[in-house]
Swiss-Prot record:
Its EC number is 2.7.7.106. It holds the Pfam family CofC. Belongs to the CofC family. NCBIfam families: F420_cofC (TIGR03552). The keyword GTP-binding applies. This is 3-phospho-D-glycerate guanylyltransferase. It comes from the Bacteria. GO terms for molecular function: GTP binding; phospholactate guanylyltransferase activity. InterPro entries: CofC, Nucleotide-diphossugar_trans. GO terms for biological process: F420-0 metabolic process. Pathway: Cofactor biosynthesis; coenzyme F420 biosynthesis. Keywords: GTP-binding, Nucleotide-binding, Nucleotidyltransferase, Transferase. SUPFAM superfamilies: Nucleotide-diphospho-sugar transferases (SSF53448).
Amino acid sequence: MARSDAFVILPVKAFVGAKSRLAPLLSVGERTMLARVMLNDVLDAAIAAVGPQSVSVVTSADDVADHARRAGVGVIDDEGARGTNAAVKVGFARIAARRRGAVLTLSSDIPGLIPSDIVALISAAERSRVALAPACDDGGTNALACDVVGRIPLCFGPGSFARHIAAANAADVRPAVLLNQRLGLDLDEPHHLMQFLDRGTSTQTDAYLRVLRLKERKGHSFVVAAQQATGARRLAV
């Protein structure tokens, strides 16, 4: 399945302090480990899709850089970038300086994705110039693939999917959109963890969350709220 003609980058912040919105449910140590195992799962999928030589993590965090090197992928210094847009822009510029072709940027908190999802995004970008995968909940963008040179303006953040569509249209591009639950579920909120566990994936993230026994933390109002939110989303589907 591996493709050597495309490149994947992942902007990643320091593990320590990651996933603050999960603080009501997980300790600092648990969130730190969760960030690590999620990155492992996303890197595994990317490596299987394009090969380790075509995957890089964009970061200025030493712990993340060391982790990426141990995984066998490249590291791009984000040059102190503030925010995802700035980090991805640095990554794209570094890739454009040494190669041409499609480049895909992925969130590091979508551990349910599989290699064929990445290949599908890259192939769609080659046909349509831009391919996007929206987040399920907040209207964000969990994946964006485009030509590394002819890319559209970056608009990551809540509500960014609509902004990316508008930016593509302004550039006279009709982007491909992949409505994919694996790509769409980023683990940001407590109820996302419950949704992810309900899918029963063969991932490091699934194994780690099951060790934590989240559903057995009875009496914790946030677990109850998370379970209720998951049920509500099922009814809405």
